[in-house]
Structures are given as C-alpha cells and as structure tokens.
From Swiss-Prot:
GO BP terms, alphabetized: translation
Entry similarity comment: Belongs to the bacterial ribosomal protein bL34 family.
GO cellular component: ribonucleoprotein complex; ribosome
Designated gene of the protein: rpmH
NCBIfam families linked: rpmH_bact (TIGR01030)
Listed name of the protein: Large ribosomal subunit protein bL34
Signal peptide: none
InterPro entries in UniProt: Ribosomal_bL34, Ribosomal_bL34_CS
Lineage: superkingdom: Bacteria
Lineage, opening ranks: Bacteria, Pseudomonadati, Pseudomonadota, Gammaproteobacteria, Pasteurellales
Keywords, in A-Z order: Ribonucleoprotein, Ribosomal protein
Amino acid sequence: MKRTFQPSVLKRNRTHGFRARMATKNGRQVLARRRAKGRKSLSA
C-alpha cells in the first residue's frame, strides 16, 4: 500500500511557504494570526 505522505521540499514550499502565504489576502491573515500568537516559525 502506498503511503499518503510522500515528502517533497519544493511542493511543501510552493503550497505552504512564506511567499505562497504572502501571495493571497487570506495567506497574509494566516501570517498575521501566527505573529499575534507568537509562533517561532511563521511558515514552512
């Protein structure tokens, strides 16, 4: 049986990376929430 998680750094960054978050209004809201919460790491 094939596992569902097949890691790829490029895919990870393109979907969850900082620049991907900054590209949309909602993504910027995600970063703002994580900053407000005090997350050490904002994005992948």
